[in-house]
């Protein structure tokens, strides 16, 4: 039997897919350390994460969703691999919408304190793969 942390992580992803960022982060501490390693950005508060990070994904892809999550309970850390998929119908940094669909594998860790509150996270993904799928850089010719 795993800890309740997996259920919190799963509920957070379900809330993301519903665009309910407040529900997604209701188990987050006010002060967190959440790092998007691909972008080199760290968020220090729940409010910053909710207001600045999460909406950026939806701005880039209004139909973005988390597909096929697999959760690994490691006690006070839950590791999840999943795919974010959607249509690039909004700006991505300096790049305008391409209208292309994408499917990007991610690995995410949520870190919990002893009371089950989320105190941080780490997100890993390949930005080059995303840009290639969107036609914003050449795809590798290697097989």
Set out the residue ranges of the language-model regions.
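C-terminal and inter-domain tail/linker signature
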Residues: 1-143
């Amino acid at each position: 039997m795993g800890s309740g942390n997996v259920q919190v992580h799963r509920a957070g992803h379900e809330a993301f897919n519903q665009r309910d960022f407040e529900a997604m982060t209701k188990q987050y501490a006010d002060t967190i350390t959440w790092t998007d390693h691909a972008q080199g950005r760290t968020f220090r508060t729940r409010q910053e994460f909710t207001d600045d990070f999460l909406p950026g994904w939806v701005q880039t892809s209004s139909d973005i969703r988390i597909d096929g999550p697999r959760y690994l309970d490691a006690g006070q850390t839950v590791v999840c691999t999943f795919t974010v998929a959607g249509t690039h119908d909004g700006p991505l940094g300096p790049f305008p919408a391409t209208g292309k669909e994408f499917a990007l594998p991610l690995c995410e860790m949520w870190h919990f304190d002893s009371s089950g509150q989320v105190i941080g996270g780490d997100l890993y993904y390949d930005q080059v793969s995303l840009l290639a799928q969107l036609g914003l850089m050449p795809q590798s010719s290697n097989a």
